[in-house]
Amino acid sequence: MFILVVNCGSSSIKADVIDSISQSTLISFSAERIPAAPVLQLNKNNIAYNGEPTVDAILSVGLLSIKEALNDKVISGIGHRVVHGGSEYSQPVLIDDKVEQAIQNLITLAPLHNPINLIGIQKAKEVFPDIPNVAVFDTAF
């Protein structure tokens, strides 16, 4: 089973496809120095990028690159690091409209991170529409 793990920050993005049986990384995407001078890599190889220096645009490129690199492999689930789950979320949760709205409502508690985390969730749903998404909250630890 292959799991996509997404960690969107205010100045960097990391996304890895993990083989849950061997626990090895199959595909690794990273983007650093957003928005100043983005550097994108897939499996440690630079990706030429001349687009907008936004998390939204860069994440689209990253997730589409991952999808292409998967070839015939199928992702079974997507996990998202989310900074703040408030008092409502103390463990991982399947993301639905209610969870997305809760993350939105908690932006005041994590104004630099929760909006970016939501972009990650929304982009993953666009690129991998039929795959379940799970939020894992920093506040659960």
Residues covered by each model-derived region:
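Short beta-strand-loop/turn "lid" adjacent to the catalytic site in phosphate-handling enzymes
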Residues: 66-113, 134, 140-141
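Glycine-rich, N-terminal phosphate-binding loop and its surrounding beta-alpha-beta segment
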Residues: 45-81
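A short acidic Gly-Thr/Ser loop motif
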Residues: 6-11
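Short glycine-rich, Thr/Ser-proximal phosphate-binding strand/loop in the N-terminal lobe
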Residues: 12-53
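Phosphate-binding/catalytic loop of phosphoryl-transfer enzymes
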Residues: 114-115, 121-141
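Extreme N-terminal starter segment of soluble prokaryotic enzymes
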Residues: 1-4
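A generic structural motif
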Residues: 19-27, 71-74, 130-131
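Conserved active-site and cofactor/substrate-binding residues in soluble primary-metabolism enzymes
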Residues: 53-57, 94, 98, 115-119
